[in-house]
Amino acid sequence: MNATLPERDFAQKWHLKALFAIILVAIIIAGSVQKVGIETEFSWDQFFQIWKEMAHPDWSYFPVIVQPILETVQMALVGTLFGTLLAIPFSLMASTNIMKNKFVLSVVRFFLNIVRAVPDMLLAAVFVAIVGIGPMAGVGALTVFSFGMISKLFYEAVETIDEGPVEALTAAGANSVQTIIFAVIPQVTNQFLSYFLYTLEINVRASTVLGYLGAGGVGLYLDQTLSMFLYDRTAIVILGILAVVVVVDGISNHLREALA
Amino acid sequence: MQKVNRTLWQRIKPWFITLVVVLIYLWAFSGIDMSSIKETAGEVTMAILNGLFHPDWDFVYIGDGEDLINALVETLAIAFLGTFISAFLTIPFAFLAAHTKRGFSAHATIGKFLLTVIRVFPEIVLALMFIKAVGPGAYAGVLAVSVHSIGMLGKLFGESIEDIDRGPNEAIVAAGGSAVDSWTLATIPAVLPAFMNYTLYRFEIAVRSASILGIVGAGGIGAPLIFALQTRNWSRVGIILLGIIVMVTVIDYLSGQIRKRLV
């Protein structure tokens, strides 16, 4: 019986890798608990008090937030458009099959990685400092944020195209601009549009909270109602955000299915 | 040569779509007041760029717990604990939302709606609620991350439960196993790699959100950043941004390597 069992060496037999991973995770957890300091009492009274007040939304506040919610959508639309326009040249420069110069390729990719590493709210904080309070700060933050995200999605799409048309055009004597317009762009248009809509969904979600830092949109009302402890109004703002996100996601999903 | 007959709608459809898109964008641009940019915008941009290239290196390590390293470690601790707790909290939600049988399923519909609500509920508001309950600090951040992550993890976990091969479950039931046997011996082993993969992915996102929670006082690197921005201490802003970029890049790389091995 024993002879039919597969041979396992010491490490496999005692699951050393898994054991090591579990011990490592346990150590990190212990360290994190130490760092965060979870000895404070959780005050359920305070916590449920907010929920109780939010359970009775102040519907008279609804008309006040309609305009800011629309502004949120406008910011997302404009930011996504600017981000996409910026991303197109950069994504072409970051595709291995278009950009043959290894040095430029790695510089562009490094730059895109850095842009993608900055969280959207931090961009908003920086843009509020630069252009001042208002929707322009939100548009700036969303432009940079969607630029980073779309560039990566786009260059991955460009790298998966069929090389046949590119070679045919090059063989027929087309220059690189003509090759991109007639061989690359037609192959990726649908994917580009689909990624544009996907980014728009994420931007609508992001833009609802950007206003918390003064970057325009409905987030400002989140800040105001919360700092005045008017949780019945906060509930309305959250319901409004929920509604706009669900509607935009629904439309965008429908369009993306039609594109696929 | 025969002409292809197209209906009126087919002929005008591209123009109609273009018109709708143009109208949507005219509306969008009308809402953004481009003239509201401060005159100092160029100056401030240069100052921030200057700060990025001349960062305040002294801030990296001071030793009294108010430095960059300390704040970054706290941010990572918030993200790690939050994601870890969330992975466990998510499991019941995921099984509730998983649509594993043919036809309408009430629990899956309810579960999916619940997860959408959690996903959309702003993390900052959650953080403020938990600050009410436990006071300002990293603990509130951990709780906010662990509740907010349920929304996305529940969706991803639920989808991987839907995708597994049902064969082993049926085999165990056919051999006389109970529902618990089928669960522990067939379902869990099949979904575990996907669960771990998604948890790591969510950890990458949690690192980003933990670095902003400090804005409302829920611990991490956000608080010193906002303070530096408000006091116009650009070299401080520079070093904090650099610190965040390095932290996020390293975590993304490590997590990506581990995830490659899991699949």
Where are the regions that the model predicts?
Chain B
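Membrane-cytosol interface at the C-terminal ends of specific transmembrane alpha-helices
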Residues: 136-187, 193-202, 253
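C-terminal transmembrane helix and the adjacent membrane-cytosol boundary/short C-terminal tail
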Residues: 14, 197, 238-263
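Cytoplasmic-entry segments and transmembrane alpha-helices of multi-pass inner-membrane transporters
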Residues: 93-127, 156-159
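N-terminal, non-cleaved signal-anchor transmembrane helix
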Residues: 1-84, 91-92, 96, 100
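Generic hydrophobic transmembrane alpha-helix motif, especially the helices
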Residues: 115-149
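Glycine-rich helix-loop "coupling/hinge" segments at transmembrane-helix boundaries
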Residues: 207-244, 263
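Alpha-helical membrane-interface segments at transmembrane helix boundaries
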Residues: 69-77, 111-118, 200, 204, ...
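Hydrophobic positions within alpha-helical transmembrane segments of bacterial inner-membrane proteins
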Residues: 83-91, 95, 99, 124, ...
